[in-house]
UniProtKB/Swiss-Prot annotation:
Belongs to the GatB/GatE family. GatE subfamily. It is an enzyme of class 6 (ligase). The keyword Ligase applies. One of its GO terms (biological process) is translation. Heterodimer of GatD and GatE. GO terms for cellular component: cytoplasm. This is Glutamyl-tRNA(Gln) amidotransferase subunit E. It comes from the Archaea. Keywords: ATP-binding, Ligase, Nucleotide-binding, Protein biosynthesis. It comes from Pyrococcus abyssi (strain GE5 / Orsay). PANTHER family: GLUTAMYL-TRNA GLN AMIDOTRANSFERASE SUBUNIT B MITOCHONDRIAL AND PROKARYOTIC PET112-RELATED (PTHR11659), GLUTAMYL-TRNA(GLN) AMIDOTRANSFERASE SUBUNIT E (PTHR11659:SF2). It catalyses: L-glutamyl-tRNA(Gln) + L-glutamine + ATP + H2O = L-glutaminyl-tRNA(Gln) + L-glutamate + ADP + phosphate + H(+).
Amino acid sequence: MMVMTDKFNYEELGLKVGLEIHRQLDTKKLFSPVPSELSDKVEFTFQRRLRPTMSELGEIDPAALEEFKKGRVYVYEGNYELTDLVYMDEEPPRGPDREALEVALQIAYLLNAKPVDEVYYMRKIVIDGSNVSGFQRTAIIATDGKVETPWGAVGIPTICLEEDAARIIERKDKEVIYRLDRLGIPLIEISTTPDIHHPEQAKVVAKFIGDALRATKKVKRGLGTIRQDLNVSIKGGARIEIKGVQELDMIPIIIEREVERQLNLLKIRDELRKRGVKPKDIKEEFYDVTDIFENTKSKIIARVIKKGGKVLAIKLPKFRGLIGREIQPGRRLGTEFADRAKKYVPGIFHIDELPNYGISQEEVNKVIERLNLSEEDAFVLVAAEEEKAKNALREVIKRAREAIEGVPEETRRALPDGNTEYMRPLPGKARMYPETDIPPLRIPDDLKKKIKENLPELPQAKVERYVKEYKLDRSLAQTLVDDERDELFEELVSMGVKPSLAASILVVVLKGLRKEVPIENVTDEHIREAFQLYLEGKIAKEAFEEIFKELARNPSKSAREVAEEKGLTLLSEEEVTRIIEEVIQQNIEVVKAKGMGAMGLIMGRVMAKVRGKADGKLVSQIVRRKLQEISGG
């Protein structure tokens, strides 16, 4: 299923995409009976250093090793309500939480997967400080799931139940501060096979999985509760893991940009090979060019030299004109070099972008002369403490050698504009070993049977039912379900509220107030009470907006209190008639002249007085009757 506006022929390029979706479950923590909530309250802190250990295969994971080399100390903040000894790594884990396991099984069945007979927890090595223990506990709950799409079926080989990491509060040069409230929140991890061959197909699969998760009503909502990772590759390229895709609509854009990046990196590789350069031609030789910049106008370099730092350069044979080549909109090969060097220095300078940043052409020429560069050769400069500068340039050398080979396998971070940046090497397989503190857990057959027979309705099926059963507009039904207002909607309908009115108030009115007031303060109980007043004939439907506005500002009040305080309780028919007669008398000349043509004018002026206190339909009937009496007389 090709789309005419495709930027690339993805089939020809051999595009392969796999998804990995993580979503927090709304239960207690996975291995401790404490609430899974976030809090800014800090009652204690402690610190740790973490070191990589060998897996059961006797190997050390490269990503863990790179993290260890940063030499950081990790500080942990916590409070006694949301953190216990389990998540301070001072006590063995308990559990796993029964409710979290049941929700995971629900999700497995909704995704056509087969639950395992026994759950075995493993330890995944993570030493970036986000887990106090230095590992994350994870277990396979189900296998062999499937999502059908217009492009073909996509497999779900594993569904795992694991614990979320601590949340980062502050990152310093040699210290990182984490808060422990998020550590241990149950996290469902759903991985697909790389059978996605079109960017839009990836979006369809992610939406279906998201719908299955939301159907349980047991997943958390809000920023940071869902994380979507992509694995992307093309023929001749490499598998790239892209972390932290937040929005569904960004998935196709990020995939397209990654395809573009890999294609451009392959073009750069081909050009370098054409120029005859090999990885071994890039030597780890550092040139001290500090003296060239003694009187520089570059503020960055001058500041470093003043503090006793140095300006070091490396030679990149045959790279001139390629470091500045764009590989994604606004990003160049030089940006890739800078991303690698970032762990040691804020930035780098390279020949393709100079003169610039206060660096003159004369200074550039002197560096070219000092390094004895040909017209095809390039240089990269770093201004920093000598050891930091050397480490940064080593990273550039490593990345430049990789550019000659093609596309390096790595983990990258999704950026808001759809581009990506380097995070770390792609994790190896040497990061898992068995969890010895948690015994295997057998899933009883009767529990599986009970869950399978009581699966929730999938969101799309619910939308179709609302359209058919309640005669709702499709977009209204879709929004009800997407905003997770469906349960409240069905409750209101069961109370006797017309489906169209309930949906309109929940979607149109409440969403419309979002820019004016903190509408999140209006609870389901507030909404139920307001509708009860309406059903009792105490308020008109026009009063809902005013009542919800006031409740958003003052959530401690009840809907009944607001209706009475604001004078929104319904006027009697006699009172409405009296107000209409007054308005007609005030405009009698117009009424006599226009007769029924004055209907709009009188209605407008009456509604200005009684809006929210009288039913518009009733007002219209009385106005029509009164005008007919006058016209007939």
